[in-house]
């Protein structure tokens, strides 16, 4: 199944920081079923429409079409991924493998306390936990978002509020959080200001996004989602 993964380091390309023990596929003549069955990464395009795909194969070539020794990440034409295939910090991506294995991310961890992502209006944007620690959504500064309201729980404004969906640990279903202006705490005392809440309107506490996890953000209006640790 697809797993949403995050980059916690400023990286040049997948071959610099993303290693896996999953069995590689082969490019072959470009029509080999092994290519489609190879471990793959999908990165949402900047436009928010479509994905760029990379495959983990054992017969990649470089730009001059010389064979690349060993297994590596390659584009859909079988050429090894290069620095032009850079992945931005805090940008999430999908990973899928037909075989079990482990994945390891390595690289320079960002020393910047604040890290933002631009959110395209009215569609789901994949965002990554950019830090080597679990993330509390209410430690983030969500700017330019128009909050919704919980109201009586049936208010249309709740469903129209900016929302975050985090894939459950089982890989099945999502836990949803909403950005609203009338949250309450566990004792049902009103919370001052806007914050992220669970689906029952209670302020989210603790951590919601594990290390290495990506999540989806959707808002009716464009804005920025800024981490602040």
Q: Which residue stretches match the model-derived regions?
A:
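A short, polar beta-strand/turn micro-motif
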Residues: 1-37, 45-47, 81-160, 208-229
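DUTPase catalytic domain/fold
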Residues: 141-212, 216-219
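Intrinsically disordered, low-complexity proline-rich tandem-repeat tracts
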Residues: 24, 34, 39, 44, ...
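A cross-kingdom feature marking solvent-exposed beta-strand/loop segments within repeated
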Residues: 50-89, 175-208
């Amino acid at each position: 199944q697809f797993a949403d993964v995050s980059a916690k380091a400023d990286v040049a390309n997948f071959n610099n920081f993303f290693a896996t023990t999953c069995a590689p596929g082969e490019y072959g003549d470009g029509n080999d079923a092994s290519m489609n069955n190879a471990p793959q990464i999908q990165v949402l395009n900047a436009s928010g429409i479509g994905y760029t795909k990379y495959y983990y194969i054992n017969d990649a070539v470089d730009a001059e079409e010389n064979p690349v020794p060993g297994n590596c990440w390659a584009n859909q034409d079988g050429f090894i991924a290069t620095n032009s295939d850079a992945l931005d910090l805090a940008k999430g991506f999908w990973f899928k493998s037909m075989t079990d294995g482990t994945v390891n991310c390595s690289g320079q961890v960002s020393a910047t306390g604040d890290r933002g992502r631009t959110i395209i209006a009215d569609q789901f944007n994949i965002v990554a936990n950019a830090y080597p620690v679990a993330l509390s959504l209410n430690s983030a500064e969500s700017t330019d978002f128009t909050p919704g309201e919980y109201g009586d729980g049936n208010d249309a404004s709740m469903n129209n509020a900016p929302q975050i969906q985090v894939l459950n640990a089982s890989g099945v279903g999502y836990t949803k959080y909403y950005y609203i202006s009338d949250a309450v705490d566990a004792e049902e005392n009103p919370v001052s200001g806007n914050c992220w809440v669970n689906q029952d309107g209670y302020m989210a506490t603790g951590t919601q996004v594990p290390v290495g996890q990506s999540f989806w953000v959707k808002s009716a209006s464009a804005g920025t989602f800024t981490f602040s640790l």
